[in-house]
Amino acid sequence: MPHKVSLSRLKLTDFRNYAAVSLALDGRHAVLTGNNGAGKTNLMEAVSLLSPGRGLRRAAYGDITRVGAAGGFSIFAALDGMEGEVEIGTGIEAGEETTTRKLRINGTPAKTADELTDHLRLLWLTPAMDGLFTGASSDRRRFLDRLVLSLDPAHGRRASDFERAMRSRNKLLDEGRFDPSWLAGIEEQMASLGIAMALARQEMLGLLARLIEERPESSPFPSASLQLSGFMDGQFSRPSVDLEDEYAAMLAESRYRDASAGRTLDGPHRADLIVHHREKAMEAERCSTGEQKALLVGLVLAHARLVGNLTGHAPILLLDEIAAHLDEGRRAALFDLIDGLGGQAFMTGTDQTMFSALADRAQFFTVADGKVFG
């Protein structure tokens, strides 16, 4: 069983609808119930900001500060982390530039947010993801990249560096500046970063596929088959240096086409994650809404197990409205599967009775009007 990473305290100041709130946690799962709009998801968002990035809502930091506050917000968490007990503080101060947030680990300023992954891994599932299989391909790429990030924290830096290089290329092409040596340098950088991104995604899909293959057939959630499409399809068994050369050549040959289009038409930013319901041999987008939700739950749980297996530390799960559309039997099975992962989960819902099968495996909190009771 992986080591259990768990929060013991969470304190928020001027965060969303919370002027100040403090939760004492005992390592069990945490169930947050209350009316819609009470602030349950806000608490989940705060926990999600203990990982690199902008959290489960991807909100601008300036939008997170409580309306009516002087400005800024803070999050403090104490936890039994991957390297032992640790205290993490993050937020922005009044009047600060809001594109970045401050981060302190045990009171010391962190150099980058990637340092958070030394202490915990966070995975989440929210109602906003329910349309993942039918929505835009960019949503599926973002979902896959978060899966990769949980095991390869450098993936985020590669992706942002690729985007930056691509914007530089697009700007040169838009301005009609076809300097071959300048463009070639940018395209070589894009090729190195882009192929590394694509290979990391492919590796994640392979790891998940092997784990799903080993799953018992009696699982209450359907299994998914996964593949990438739209960039260098079927080519990734070749040496990476050959792939980089091919992609760089592709970019060089498509300069005038991309200039006319106003964007780069080939690259990992154009790939799509294709998901099938294995048992039905059906594309996920053609499955019923309930089947899509069950597929997504099964996929997130498989990934959580993979993270625990490969790191030796169970990830913390944030499961927003997870029980809303599951019958009683499937809810109970879900809670058992979450238990089997060996970690701590935060779950939300409007009705506490939907979580009764957890019994004493969880702490129960009631959320109302910017306050938490329990």
Curated annotation (Swiss-Prot):
Keywords: ATP-binding, Cytoplasm, DNA damage, DNA repair, DNA replication, DNA-binding, Nucleotide-binding, SOS response. ATP binds at G34, N35, N36, G37, A38, G39, K40, T41. One of its GO terms (molecular function) is single-stranded DNA binding. The keyword Nucleotide-binding applies. Its main location: cytoplasm. InterPro entries: AAA+_ATPase, DNA-binding_RecF, DNA-binding_RecF_CS, P-loop_NTPase, RecF/RecN/SMC_N, RecF_2. Pfam families: SMC_N. It is found in: Cytoplasm. The RecF protein is involved in DNA metabolism; it is required for DNA replication and normal SOS inducibility. RecF binds preferentially to single-stranded, linear DNA. It also seems to bind ATP. Belongs to the RecF family. This is DNA replication and repair protein RecF. The lineage of its organism: Bacteria, Pseudomonadati, Pseudomonadota, Alphaproteobacteria, Hyphomicrobiales.
